[in-house]
From Swiss-Prot:
Summary of subunit composition and partner proteins: Monomer.
Biological-process GO terms, alphabetical: ribosome disassembly
One Pfam family hit: IF3_N
UniProt name for this protein: Translation initiation factor IF-3
Keyword DNA repair carried by entry: no
Keywords associated with the record: Cytoplasm, Initiation factor, Protein biosynthesis
GO MF annotation terms: ribosome binding; translation initiation factor activity
Gene, per the UniProt record: infC
Length: 176
């Protein structure tokens, strides 16, 4: 049975229903019981009566050590947060008239970011009259995309935004 844990579940005296479908300490079904009988069973076992599914008919209550349950749940949540990887967007700035050596340095940095699992935004800023030659900037972006095609996919094609042209690359995920 999957327990949906909210911030606070109804426990012991907070439960305000007549009867509950009772689940034992080991997960065994104890049947539909009046609330008073369920609470006396919980007291006898020295555990809490926790209403785990209040929307069910009749509501489902379980005998459990609530403190231990809450601790385990928080521990599980913390573990899941650790496993999540945060993807950041790194930026590599280029120029439409970039030299080969500079391009290779920027390319090396971009590849490093992609290998670490980050997305890369490749941008070109047009200065002065360079804006009239957008095709040169598009060629530089295309060369960058072609040089990283073995480890990245184009997430967003080359696009103009004011005096800036950019595209976004994402690492090829291993989870196919």
């Amino acid at each position: 049975m999957k327990i949906i844990a909210k911030k606070d579940l109804f426990i012991n005296d907070e439960i305000r229903v007549r009867e509950v479908r009772l689940v034992g300490l080991e997960g065994e079904q104890l049947g539909i019981k009046p609330l008073s009988e369920a609470q006396s069973l919980a007291d006898a076992s020295n555990v809490d009566l926790v209403l785990i599914q209040p929307q069910a008919v009749p509501p489902v209550a379980k005998l459990m050590d609530y403190g231990k349950f809450k601790f385990e749940y928080q521990k599980k949540q913390k573990e899941q947060r650790k496993k999540q990887s945060v993807v950041t967007v790194k930026e590599v700035r280029l120029s439409p008239v970039i030299d080969k050596g500079d391009f290779e340095t920027k390319l090396r940095n971009g590849r490093k970011f992609l290998e670490k699992g980050n997305k890369v935004k490749v941008s070109i800023r047009f200065k002065g009259r360079m804006i009239t030659h957008k095709e040169i900037g598009a060629k530089v972006l295309a060369d960058f995309a072609e040089a990283t095609q073995d480890i990245a996919i184009i997430e967003q094609r080359a696009k103009m935004d004011g005096r800036q042209m950019f595209m976004q690359l994402a690492p090829i995920s291993d989870k196919k």
